[in-house]
């Protein structure tokens, strides 16, 4: 039951109606008996500054941040954890007296899932995209010791990501790649990560069709039955789905907010239940 003492949490994005985070986080609150509610908060890009100030004024205890607000959210926090600082993007905010403290849970979520999928040190990796999610994936791939190539439609964005991460992680092996050579880069890679919003509801555009192999690991940040995920499954590649990333990063966020271990299995079941009801 919602009362005057119920703590407020939410996810900020544009668009955000498709988000599965409310089902997942509310299931976690219910499982552990936390008096809290989590809602989706649609915020246009030009309103993000006032939205974060307003959420703090309204007493929200924590927020997740999704496309396209992660880099801007990091710049609006009064403090950042070391990963968010290195990545230059924040996807989890925790209320403090002075404002928001920013964290990046996408990056450690990616690292743990890719490591579990068998990504080996020294392997070649291709990252597609240069936004907030891509920056988190780049950090994860660098931490795993891969030879990373970053391809984005805007070449300068890929180059900027590489410069920023090289400065934050000395010794990182990464460089920008030509987006026009995406198919060849994917063929040469042992790991392919889609860090773009292609496949997300409300986002136009497609990636060039990529052919995968059974010996590759493919991670798609976008959840659902995307073209990329279907191609990876058809090839027998080891697929790390957007749902897996969502659950893992959400579990890390839950712990940041509550100080309690997240009921990750319950969170995953909440996503499966929604998918089954569609």
UniProtKB/Swiss-Prot annotation:
Keywords: Amino-acid biosynthesis, Aromatic amino acid biosynthesis, NADP, Oxidoreductase
Binding site for shikimate: 19-21, 66, 91, 106, 223
Catalytic activity: shikimate + NADP(+) = 3-dehydroshikimate + NADPH + H(+)
Active-site residue numbers: 70
Example GO molecular function: shikimate 3-dehydrogenase (NADP+) activity
Family from the record: Belongs to the shikimate dehydrogenase family.
Quaternary structure and interacting proteins, as annotated: Homodimer.
Name of the protein in its database record: Shikimate dehydrogenase (NADP(+))
Organism: Anaeromyxobacter sp. (strain K)
């Amino acid at each position: 039951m919602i009362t005057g003492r119920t703590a407020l949490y939410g996810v900020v994005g544009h668009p955000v109606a498709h988000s599965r985070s409310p089902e997942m986080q509310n299931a976690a609150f219910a499982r552990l008996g936390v008096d809290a509610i989590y809602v989706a908060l649609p915020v246009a890009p030009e309103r993000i500054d006032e939205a974060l100030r307003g959420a703090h004024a309204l007493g929200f205890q924590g927020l997740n941040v999704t496309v396209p607000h992660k880099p801007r959210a990091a710049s609006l926090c009064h403090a950042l954890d070391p990963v968010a600082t290195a990545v230059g993007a924040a996807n989890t905010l925790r209320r403090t007296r002075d404002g928001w403290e920013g964290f990046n849970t996408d990056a450690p979520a990616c690292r743990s899932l890719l490591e579990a999928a068998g990504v080996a040190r020294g392997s070649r990796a291709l990252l597609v995209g240069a936004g907030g999610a891509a920056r988190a994936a780049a950090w994860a791939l660098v931490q795993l010791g891969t030879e990373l190539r970053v391809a984005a439609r805007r070449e300068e964005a890929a180059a900027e990501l590489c410069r920023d991460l090289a400065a934050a992680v000395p010794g990182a092996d990464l460089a920008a790649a030509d987006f026009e050579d995406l198919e060849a880069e994917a063929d040469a890679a042992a790991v392919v990560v889609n860090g773009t919003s292609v496949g997300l509801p409300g986002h136009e555009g497609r990636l060039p069709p990529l052919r995968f192999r059974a010996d590759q690991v493919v991670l798609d940040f976008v959840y659902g039955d995307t073209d990329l995920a279907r191609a990876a499954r058809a090839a027998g590649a080891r697929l790390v789905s957007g749902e897996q990333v969502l659950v893992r990063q959400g579990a890390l966020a839950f712990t940041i907010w509550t100080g309690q271990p997240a009921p990750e299995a319950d969170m995953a079941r909440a996503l499966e239940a929604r998918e089954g009801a569609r």
